[in-house]
């Protein structure tokens, strides 16, 4: 059930629209301004398309296209005109919106950032992509963690970006922090189609969490994006799926965060987000509450290392034309100082 794409909205439903936006080419500030206008127009289309819609979601790269250009002239700032236009579009159309920007970083490479703006034009969620699609993408690794917010109609919402969703730990973190709906925006192209589909479903099922996922669409003359808007219910079943590859189509469905809450509390079989920390509770009271996973201990200790670590051949972006980096990240950078 998806309420006929949100046409029939139930008392506790949240209607989501996923914009399979036509892939643009953005090189200049003028291109950026033109694409900003296109996105603003599409926010209006979303409202005209479906009066019941609560949240409209735009894909990763919707503003900048699939260029890896880090030219500061076309990078965005939170107080810049592009974000201001998105805020006003949400106000004008009385709708929440999820947007993608490549964000200027004075201390390194730009961030690949995502914003959720409410219907009053306020930024409610600000996220920087944790896992850039290496070795292809040059973006700075995110440093803000994964925020979870209270979205439209009280739904708990998280946002991850593209390659993030290939790491099961990302979806688990969203759910662990309370997310009932996880948005995944992407710029993926056709070769990733199968991986895209099964990870969207797995991320939902393993965490009893709705996932709402969308890519860019169409061709820019070099790359062919696939659209593939998918709204997946918390049991892994697909509620809506854009399979035609039609650019600027908006894929819609009603989702039910209240049923997510009910499942997380009431399910026995396959309540995996709970059972991870309560292994074998039939045999031992409360289950085994330990951490048997070596990789988790090693990550916390800063000693994560694969058995084949020294054999990995691609460890920077030089194969894709980027210079080898010299800076280090986070605690390592502070220690070096």
UniProtKB/Swiss-Prot annotation:
Protein's UniProt name: Formamidase
Catalytic machinery residues: 60 (proton acceptor), 129 (proton donor), 162 (nucleophile)
Gene3D superfamilies: Carbon-nitrogen hydrolase
Family: Belongs to the carbon-nitrogen hydrolase superfamily. Aliphatic amidase family.
Domain (CN hydrolase) ranges: 14-257
GO molecular function: formamidase activity; N-carbamoylputrescine amidase activity
Keyword Hydrolase applies: yes
